[in-house]
């Protein structure tokens, strides 16, 4: 199996968590796209979806799947999304696709968060993948200086604006040994909308696609 096939295998395993009558939270990115495409086959069984990005909403609608506003949908039973990294505690780095704030909101509003990924995403310590931080534009330089004090090297994601109209700083070379504390600290910086550490609300289940099949943690 190549990496894309591993992602699809993880997405197929996540479909098993979808029950009739659910409103399903749906993430963003290449692995989540596999889940969306598979969800199309059972779209008549669910009551709708909540998307974590405009891109995912468009893909869902392209399959004829209803997309609802989270404020209307209320508490969700299930959220399925990918990750850029996960540790053994199911703390994640997310936001490579730029949808981290909406992803974090939908995850917080969901009873169960099933994370799907290929096996390369499981790491001992978070931080090899550059950590995305969504920032209000006027605070970009200030937040970058503060992130540098933490030992990271923040780089503006050039030519990219989030669905919320903000910018992203990708922070390189951070060793995130305490994800919960780091998430809290960065989120406290004025001008930060959210950081792409998902530790205070980690995944409940991690499904990894591998050459040998599926592995579940949690």
Curated annotation (Swiss-Prot):
GO BP field: D-ribose metabolic process; pentose-phosphate shunt, non-oxidative branch
Keyword Isomerase among record annotations: yes
Keywords attached to this entry: Isomerase
Keyword Lyase: no
GO CC entries: cytosol
Xref: InterPro entries: NagB/RpiA_transferase-like, Ribose5P_isomerase_typA_subgr, Ribose5P_isomerase_type_A
Pfam families: Rib_5-P_isom_A
Reaction catalysed by this enzyme: aldehydo-D-ribose 5-phosphate = D-ribulose 5-phosphate
Gene Ontology MF annotations: ribose-5-phosphate isomerase activity
Pathway in which the depicted protein is active: Carbohydrate degradation; pentose phosphate pathway; D-ribose 5-phosphate from D-ribulose 5-phosphate (non-oxidative stage): step 1/1
Active site, UniProt feature: 103 (proton acceptor)
Subunit structure: Homodimer.
Similarity-based family: Belongs to the ribose 5-phosphate isomerase family.
PANTHER family: RIBOSE-5-PHOSPHATE ISOMERASE
Protein's recorded name: Ribose-5-phosphate isomerase A
